[in-house]
Amino acid sequence: PVSRQQCSQRIQGERFNQCRSQMQDGQLQSCCQELQNVEEQCQC
């Protein structure tokens, strides 16, 4: 599986601004589904 850091580095574009903000706030669970929709190997 891909690490959280690697997954966060893959999140680019305006549609993921909220996702990045949640990760910075430590709300990884809120971001996890969105990450997995883009990169199935991402594990949160």
Swiss-Prot record:
Keywords: Antimicrobial, Disulfide bond, Fungicide, Seed storage protein, Storage protein. SUPFAM superfamilies: Bifunctional inhibitor/lipid-transfer protein/seed storage 2S albumin. Signal peptide: none annotated. Disulfide bonds join C7-C42, C19-C31. Transmembrane segments: none annotated. The keyword Manganese does not apply. The keyword Disulfide bond applies. GO terms for biological process: defense response to fungus; defense response to oomycetes; killing of cells of another organism. One of its GO terms (molecular function) is nutrient reservoir activity. Belongs to the 2S seed storage albumins family. The mature protein consists of a small and a large chain linked by 2 disulfide bonds. This is a 2S seed storage protein. Has antifungal activity. Inhibits spore germination in H.sativum (IC(50)=62.5 ug/ml) and P.betae (IC(50)=62.5 ug/ml). Inhibits growth of H.sativum, V.albo-atrum and P.infestans. This is 2S seed storage albumin protein. The lineage of its organism: Eukaryota, Viridiplantae, Streptophyta, Embryophyta, Tracheophyta.
